[in-house]
Amino acid sequence: MLSRRGHRLSRFRKNKRRLRERLRQRIFFRDKVVPEAMEKPRVLVLTGAGISAESGIRTFRAADGLWEEHRVEDVATPEGFDRDPELVQAFYNARRRQLQQPEIQPNAAHLALAKLQDALGDRFLLVTQNIDNLHERAGNTNVIHMHGELLKVRCSQSGQVLDWTGDVTPEDKCHCCQFPAPLRPHVVWFGEMPLGMDEIYMALSMADVFIAIGTSGHVYPAAGFVHEAKLHGAHTVELNLEPSQVGNEFAEKYYGPASQVVPEFVEKLLEGL
């Protein structure tokens, strides 16, 4: 019997030809006419909570498995939302307000990745596990938020996604449907499929360089991206505060604060272009 990961990879590979044609419309996959642009590597970057920690974004989960003194099951699962939507909305309202405080700003690591995108243009793609918007605020534009976005909400009936910067209450409804439905945070909860997976696996199959930054290596499917990239011949790099659970999979490794190791590595990479 296939595992969930096995089913996902099987489905991806069956649709590979169709996906390749569709994904060429994304800037990461589009071939350029200018010869020198073709010589630049395709770089896929994965970021996790470690890149935003120095900006003041807390990583939520503590050593005891609690998120801000709440059980994960209560605030980060569909079942928890069904049981107590008011508690779940209050939890994410607090996170949303924190993200918009003036002291929360992109740090040197975010800015370095924006600089890397500027240099690589169409051949750069950023996949983040983070639900904040610090990459966009730093200047990155080609970003896949595989775990959703804190400053958006989703209609629980139609799935339509809406920009939302204020608090959400149980009384707030989506009016995109024939019958107004409750709004929920546009966040991937435990037990739900991450977003953009077909695009991500396609990008992994085409990347020349795969870089993981600030990730723990605990959470799948993201923890398996390095293995997938290696299967397709990508050079793999880990930039982290300490070795991740899958650190031995990487060909190149640098450890230290993200605001230090990421800019240093980006400069090294740019020198080689």
Swiss-Prot record:
Organism per entry: Shigella flexneri
Protein name: NAD-dependent protein deacylase
InterPro entries, sorted: DHS-like_NAD/FAD-binding_dom, NAD-dep_sirtuin_deacylases, Sirtuin, Sirtuin_cat_small_dom_sf, Sirtuin_class_III, Ssirtuin_cat_dom
Catalytic residues as annotated in Swiss-Prot or TrEMBL: H147
Subcellular location: Cytoplasm
One protein family per Pfam: SIR2
Keyword Protein biosynthesis found: no
Residues noted as binding NAD(+) in the record, renumbered to the chain: 48-67, 129-132, 214-216, 240-242, 258
Primary localization: cytoplasm
